[in-house]
Amino acid sequence: MGLQALSGVAKDLTKMSAKSAVKLVVAEDEDATLFKWVAILTGSKNTLKGVGFFLGGALLTWLGYEVALYGMAGAVALSFVAVLLLMTGDLGKAKEKVKFSVILTKSPAINILSGARFFLFGARDIWFVVGLPLFLASQLNWNHTQIGSYMAAWVIGYGLVQSISPQIANHNANAGSARLWLLALIVLTGVMSGSIYLDFQPALTVLTGLIIFGFIFALNSSIHSYLILVYSDRDKVALNVGFYYMANAGGRLAGTLISGLAYQFGGILFCLLTALGFLIASWLIALALPHSDTGLIPRKQENSG
């Protein structure tokens, strides 16, 4: 368990560093290019995560646990060597040390976006992490393989949507579009809750609703990932992104814990209603995001980048 925890910390540090680097290698006035590469990086990461579910199962089946671990360690070692050879050592290094408290006192936009992110990801995991698998097993009689395959396929699709989110969102990523897609999630989750409460095709509601939820959620997540870079100074981008992902991790932890409790109290319906509350909280926080032209990306600019 300790090694698993350290692995998770290393993964988040790698994710934070990679997204911070995008801000540093893209010119400051190339908003469309920044959105495009953030979307590609975020989407490919989640798509590979979904593929990893399938590969993990295959490696366990074909090679066994110990050999599978050696194989993964070898792949990570090759990546480490590539980073040492190809990446400059001063990329993203701050000019001066910054105290943690500075983020809270001098970055209101980042604080607000991080708060919205906390409740957004908490809302997803409240019904996705524990409630959904239990619903599929107890109500639809799915086995472990079916549940794992469905959720892995969902993660892959989610990542693919993130990768092309600039085209889907018409190259429009700003605080207003973030609030709009959040509102769409609120409406969808409310409709799903009502359908299940009325016992109207609950299985179809959950399976179809999850696909639509993933599509909208992927767009919202990509816009958030873009906005955190827009709101960050180049010199402190890694620090700001790290704080933002701390909120992301906190939301996921809260969502995971609440998911099991909510399902025990009232099944998938109570999970959805609790998620709905988190989405509303995220939307209310997002109302305070700065109103500006930042993030309005002309379509023609993307082609020139």
Annotate each language-model stretch with its function.
Residues D235-Q264:
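A late C-terminal transmembrane helix in Major Facilitator Superfamily
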Residues V130-I147:
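Short amphipathic helix-loop junctions that connect adjacent transmembrane helices
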Residues G2-K45:
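Cytoplasmic helix-loop-helix junction between adjacent transmembrane helices
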Residues D29-L41, H144, S232-Y244:
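Loop-to-transmembrane helix entry/capping segments in MFS-fold secondary transporters
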